Amino acid sequence: MPISQSIERACRRYEEVQAEGLTLYPILVEEMETFELARPGIDIVQQSLPVAYAVMPLLAAYYKMEYDAMERGEETVGLLSMALLMLALSLRLGRGKPLDERLKAFRCKVDTKDPSRLTAVEFVLHGEELWRITPVQFQYLREIIAAQNGIELTPPEANPELVEAQRELAEMNGGAKLSGEAWERVATVAALEHAEETEIESWPLLKLQTKAKTWQRILGYMTCTIAEARGTQWKRGNPWPSLFYDRVSEGNTALRPVEESTRGMGQA
């Protein structure tokens, strides 16, 4: 179910969103490390899952994968925990508590006749209200959480093999390997914005991403404009042709096939 224009507008403004009776908040920079831990539970390419799981609502598929792995005596992958952790971040459930305590806030409810089928997850909000989210509801909430926090999801019709090929091509053309440390991005944006790093920690993650992309575009445009004036040419065209708009990427290269999300975490 696609999100509405009003929700998209709220996401761009870094506002909270009401959905399914719940309030979803933009995740803040101060929780970036936890966000990155939970991210594979949201941005996985579901089409890359085995067919039996690919056709299920994502949360139900995660539960079924974990159940089947335990039945075989194998190590579980952890995607269900990642998805629930992302939900906790978005709801600000258990904020400030250790990760294991935040995850313990959720209770999985299953079909009484088929214990491998997840029917809902339950949790207590504000210390008193019992809430229930079904896998179908999570499908919709996932779209909002992604939009609020700068995650680009793969469309259902996407070819997972093509997505993986595009990602690998982007990595090959990406030049030097970067550290990817979150604090480095925060420190750089703080310097460019003439702000304290502690101030930026209170920003929504999407705001940090937007500011970083904007500064990258400004500096890239200035550098390439000077280079073009000196006769420089690029095989695939100027990478920064506009001061105001990003160059359109060929395909979504930010998506995670299941093999990447589960690498080093056992097999499902």
What are these regions (language model features)?
Residues 69-77, 97, 109-117, 234-236:
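Intrinsically disordered, low-complexity coil segments
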Residues 202-268:
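Alpha-helical oligomerization segments
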